[in-house]
Amino acid sequence: MSKPKIYIALCSFGKDSIATILLALENNEPLDRVVFSEVMFDHERGISGEIPEHIEWVYNTAIPKLESMGVKVDVVRGKLDYVTLCRRKLKSGKKAGQMYGLQSARFCYANSECKVAPINAYYKQFSKEYDIVKYVGIAIDEPKRLARLEGTNKVSLLAKYGYTEKMAMAKCEEYDLVSPNYRGGEFRGGCWFCYNANISRYVNIRKNYPHYWQAIRDLYYETNTKAFKYGKTLAEVEREMDSLEFNQRNQLTLF
């Protein structure tokens, strides 16, 4: 006997996942729940790994608005946070006993343990009773990503209704559900502490959330790692940040 289906949308609160939810509502597609996995930088201090402006918008604007439309939103977090992962010690090899340190381009354990693991645990609670259909935000103009959905339990409503990424953004704008991550036409999603982040993001964090940047500095020196983009040291990254801030100030004085 087949199990009943449960329809769950995986949502990052970016344009594609929000547009997916809106299309489901507009077209009476089955939608039982929405799940958002929040990466945590430090549970103890209550520091999220999400871009500060984005996570504030998620909790204060996006979730309340979706819930007012009848959408059930579940937030999950991993048992481990980024700080804990960085402090874990290697058990074997030449570096046994040393801390893992900051994530690197070679291995992003923050994604696997802080984001993916809690999502998998969330799905597991339904898997015995239901066949899970997962709505994912992949637009019709992303053919390679869509091809990977074949033969899985993942469904793209954006593709079903012929939505491109540009159309997904327009749908979010229609409902006034656009994350601050898209300000200025540039998407700035992902974790604020990511090794691969551009310098302007770090400048924004240091300027507006100095205790966040200090937390990264402390962790960098505590774990004795060099794990910024292209293997740059913290000193090299901060010199680039200082240079960018200097140039930004000079541009402002011209006007």
Locations of the language-model features?
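Nucleotide-activated chemistry modules centered on ATP-dependent adenylation/adenylyltransferase
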Residues: 1-255
